[in-house]
Amino acid sequence: MSLEGIGFGYRERAPYACDPARSRGRLVPEPESPTRTPFQRDRDRIIHSTAFRRLKHKTQVFIAHEGDHYRTRLTHTIEVAQIARALARALRLDEDLAEAVALVHDFGHTPFGHTGEEALNDRMKAFGGFDHNAQSLRIVTKLEHRYADFDGLNLSWETLEGLVKHNGPLLGAHAAHPDAAVPLPILDFNERYDLELTRFASLEAQCAAIADDIAYNAHDIDDGLRAGLLSLDALDEVPLTKRLLDLVRTRYPDLDPVRTGHELVRRQITIMVEDVIEEAQRRLAAAKPQSVEDVHGQSHALVAFSDTMRTDEKVLKRFLFKNLYFHDSVVVRRHAADKILQDLFDTCFANPSIMPSEWQSGCETLDEAARARRVADYLAGMTDNYAVREHRRLFDHTPDLA
């Protein structure tokens, strides 16, 4: 690809980039910092939050007990932020905003990955459901208790809208999932602070969203190979990974399997990043946005895979779902994790006094929906390890996740 027009940290910000000097501000007004932009302050608040530290002990596919080298939500988040920042720099966007959205995007995930989310959503169906993106919003607007003047982190409008809409509009003609109901916590907050749910998020948020796809597509392969759930031979069945493996084997015919896997992963990240940059440049040239408002008003995302890469990526995802996420050994752990969280929900909902004092306080005055949301907030904030410990404390038998 050509490096013409690529930003490397010294080029002027593009006219369609978010300008921190023109931020729409915060829900609770605050004095500006003399040393940091609003987006830098958002990033720093996210990094110093309790929710960020908890990501260290929350897993994605592999349960934490399996080993120290598998990715957690924290390591995944750092990898997403690195890719998002690289994309933003190349497209001459605000790197700090892209990084902030990337760093906060997984705050609302439960223990035990998507299994935990499914378990909580099952128990919360009668009370508005549970959605990790909506939970991320609750954390940064309500559940973090660090500041004297407000609950949450009081992030800028741009970071909040990027968090909520990084995968596309939630309502209207261009909604990413038009048949899906918007989670109640998002609708409730939107009444207080309009995040323009029918419009596309900033290019910085779009960079964070696609960086998430790039990161987990590659790194789940890395973890799957390490765990022995995937093999290089099996990856030869996937067009994208076969092409990359052929390149590696041609250049390094005697390379051992472990390094071959690493070479595959790094090449996959590189080729996807380069594809996104090239496709984004093509879409930007066609759309000719001259402002952030022009970006918001588009009918489609401007940061995206090319048609060819999107097809390859879908095939890869189908392969990973079949061979990794629903591998027999992973499914066994998923069932165990599911039972742990559902047991904890049922017990805490029936008897809130078993929760820590700050969570049980005032539960006796709450209606069922509010009490269920309180329990879901408590459980969603747990790490994998803490959820297992609590289950062992409360029950005679805890499913084995090892």
From Swiss-Prot:
Keywords: Hydrolase
Stretches assigned to the HD domain: 73-217
The keyword Hydrolase belongs to this UniProt entry's keyword annotation: yes
Signal peptide: none
Classification via NCBIfam families: dGTP_triPase (TIGR01353), HDIG (TIGR00277), PRK01286.1-1 (NF002326), PRK01286.1-3 (NF002328)
GO MF term set: triphosphoric monoester hydrolase activity
Organism per entry: Brucella anthropi (strain ATCC 49188 / DSM 6882 / CCUG 24695 / JCM 21032 / LMG 3331 / NBRC 15819 / NCTC 12168 / Alc 37)
Family recorded in the similarity comment: Belongs to the dGTPase family. Type 2 subfamily.
Pfam families: HD, HD_assoc
Protein's recorded name: Deoxyguanosinetriphosphate triphosphohydrolase-like protein
SMART domains the UniProt entry points to: HDc (SM00471)
